[in-house]
Structures are given as C-alpha cells and as structure tokens.
Regions:
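Structural signature of beta-strand start/N-cap positions in the alpha/beta core
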Residues: 100, 126, 177-179, 202-203, ...
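The conserved SAM/SAH-binding core of class I Rossmann-like methyltransferase domains
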Residues: 102, 128-130, 207, 345, ...
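Active-site loop/oxyanion-hole signature of alpha/beta-hydrolase fold enzymes
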Residues: 132-181, 197, 217
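Flexible "cap/lid" subdomain of the alpha/beta-hydrolase fold that forms the substrate-access gate
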Residues: 148-152, 159-160, 197-363
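Catalytic histidine-centered segment of alpha/beta-hydrolase-like enzymes
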Residues: 352-353, 376-385
Length: 396
C-alpha cells in the first residue's frame, strides 16, 4: 500500500498546481472580534485538583516539581481587550543558553499528551506546552464558531498572543527563536501559524498532522489509507457525529455514556511492558509507579471532560471528516509559500492521511522530511516515545 501511494504521488508531483483561493484566503491577515465573548474565571474547584495531580504525575516521571518542571496560568489580552488565561506546562527555570521548544497538542487532549517526551527533552531544551484556549485546563471562552476561516483565525490569533508572551516579551529571559511541534489538530494549527507568523521559528516538527492533504487532487483516496475498521468508523462519523456536532464532553455528561467514558478515557495505551520505553538512559525507571501513573492520567482526563464549556467542536468547522479532510488544506501553501524546514512523523498504525506529506517530500526532500515509526498508532508520542529521540538528535 505504501509503494502504491508513492507511485501515485510521484506521478502527481510533476504537475504544477496553483494554490486554491481557499488556501490564499486562509493566510490573509485578519483580526478576531469577540467583544461579546464571556470568558470564565479560573474555576477554583478544578484548579485545586489539577495542580496536585500534575505535580504527582511529573514526580512519577522522576522530575522535581518547581525545579525541573512546573505549570502555571498565564494571563493573556487580545487586540479587543478580551481577557484569557492559558494553562502552561514549562521548564521551571528556563536557561537563556538553551534552545526552546513549544508544543501544540491535538483534539480532546491537553499538553499532557507529550508527557513521555518531557523527561528526555527537558535536559536539552526549555520546553513550553500550553493548553489550547478552550481545551485542557486553559480558560473556556464561549466562542460561537461559524465558518472554517473564522475558526482557524481564532486559534491562530490566540496562539500568536501566547507565543508573543513567551518568546518576544522577555517573560522568561530566553532566546527569541524556538522550535515548533504540533500533533494532529495541533499540527494543523502549527502549520497555519508558521505560514502566518514565521518570525523566530527555526524548524517545525509535525506529529501525524491533520489537514495537510488536499483531497481535491485526483488519486487522493482517504479510505485507502485506513484499514476496514477505521473506514467504518469514518463513515459513522460522517453520517452521525459530524452533522450533530457531538463533542466528547456531550457524550460524557450523557447518562448513557458517562460510566463508559469515565472508565476508559485517559488510560493511554503506552507500552509500559517494553524495557526500552520503561527505562531512562541512566537506567532509572521511566515511570516510578505504573498503576498510580495511569490513575493520575485518567483523573486528569476526567477533570478536563468535567470542566464545562470546551471548544472541541472547532473540528466540525475545520474538518469535513476526522482526521484527514479539511476545508482549508495546507499542502499547496506549504509547497509554494513556506521557507521553514519541516519534519513529518507518522505512527506505524496511524490512521492519519499521509498523501500531502509524501507529495511535499517528493517536491523538496531537503525541506520536507518524513518518517514512520516502527510501533504505535496516531498517538505514538506516548505509545513509543523513544522512537522520536533520534529525530530530535538529528534535526533539532
């Protein structure tokens, strides 16, 4: 199947294509007016539970809270004086001599998605992992999405404020350059952000990014990249979830699904039984207490679901069907407008579409690198984290 895809791509990449009007319009500079938006205050009953759990989680990763790693809520104000706060996991004492890495998480998750990379990366970089506004444990503004462009502009403008505060307002006395990484929906956001605000970005790492491929190009078949099971789920999502704009939070508060989601959500399927993943380079255990660690992750995931007013419905306005097809594909913009090197990584059993990444690699193999892990699926960053270490060593 991989060879078949590459043959199709080689035939297609020789044909020059114009960037669609949709892609051009998505890059145009715009502003978001949300003066009527009601932004909630930090909810103390959630915050009082979240911080102790995060502290315990990272201590279970052999990281000292307040010395190696810390989390905080940073205040943000947009151009219309709307106030937000962003929950940020970061290096506790940023080193001005180290390089910086900023991570953007994906759909129905938080910055904790990258937990398995933190013990390795924190020794080499200042790391900053914000929860996207409206997700994780950041504030939940009541934004009413209406179109792909408006949704994208909101997310990009918010991240512009976050990144300006971290790197360009001397908040932490660090370098103004940084590496940018995005996973899934976060990969879509990172790509769009890079095209609009390239200042300071050294390289970009896209982990199974959504929204890259332009499915209007002949021969790009979404279903051909999925096994039968995922293709069936794909059709179910198309016919049921998408028209109704159902969120995980909606399912969670529904009596019919409450117990099911509560029992399963947050139990990440990382390979704790594999020694190369369980152990750090110095031989110490990667996770001190595995069962306790799973319990903490589950409790944090449940708190995120119980935290009212999430904005995860943004995907219904950005994508025509998860996780591949988007109203505003990025492939053409990256091919003709991008000046920054990008590394794409996909899991061995990843359901995410790779056509666009392969076409970009064929177009310019020096600027666009692509790798597939030997283990893991869409969430290989915690299923098989050490496979990413050589990529960090080589490119970052």
């Amino acid at each position: 199947m991989e060879n078949q895809q590459q043959d199709i791509i080689k035939n297609q990449v020789t044909k020059r294509r114009k960037i669609s009007m949709e892609e051009n319009s998505s890059i145009a500079k715009t502003t978001i007016k949300l003066k009527n938006t009601i932004v909630d205050e930090p909810l103390s009953k959630y915050k009082s539970k979240i911080l102790p759990l995060e502290k315990e989680l990272f201590e279970n990763l052999n990281l000292e809270w307040g010395v190696d790693i810390i989390s905080e809520d940073i205040p943000l104000i947009d151009i219309n004086n709307n106030e937000y706060y962003c929950h940020l996991i970061r290096t506790a004492n940023p080193d001005p001599d180290k390089d910086n890495f900023l991570f953007i998480h994906g759909f129905i998750t938080s910055g904790l998605h990258f937990f398995a990379l933190i013990p390795y990366l924190i020794k080499r970089y200042n790391i900053f992992i914000p929860d996207t506004i409206g997700m994780g444990f950041s504030c939940r503004p009541q934004v009413k999405f209406s179109s792909p462009k408006q949704t994208e502009d909101f997310l990009i403008s918010i991240y512009h404020i976050i990144i300006e505060n971290i790197f360009f307002k001397n908040l932490y006395n660090i370098k103004k350059e940084y590496y940018l990484c995005g996973h899934s929906l976060g990969g879509f956001i990172a790509s769009r952000y890079m095209l609009k605000y390239p200042k300071g970005i050294k390289k970009v790492l896209l982990l199974s990014p959504a929204g890259i491929t332009n499915h209007k190009i002949p021969g790009t078949n979404i279903g051909s990249n999925m096994n039968c099971c995922f293709y069936c789920l794909y059709i179910i999502a198309l016919t049921c979830l998408w028209p109704c704009k159902i969120r995980a939070q909606d399912l969670y508060i529904c009596c019919c699904f409450h117990n099911c989601i509560k029992e399963s959500y947050g139990f990440y399927d990382f390979n704790l039984d594999e020694e190369e993943i369980k152990k750090n380079k110095d031989g110490s255990k990667f996770i001190v207490d595995e069962e306790k660690f799973k319990e903490i992750l589950s409790n944090l995931a449940i708190l995120s679901l119980e935290y009212p007013g999430d904005l995860n419905d943004c995907i219904y306005y950005l994508f025509t069907l998860p996780p591949s097809s988007t109203f505003l594909p990025i492939e053409g913009s990256l091919m003709y407008l991008n000046t920054i090197d990008i590394v794409f990584v996909y899991g061995k059993n990843d359901f995410m579409d790779k056509f666009g990444a392969y076409r970009l690699n064929q177009y310019d193999p020096n600027k666009y690198k692509i790798y597939t892990t030997k283990f893991g699926g869409h969430s290989f960053a915690y299923e098989s984290p050490k496979e990413l270490y050589p990529i960090f060593e080589e490119f970052f």
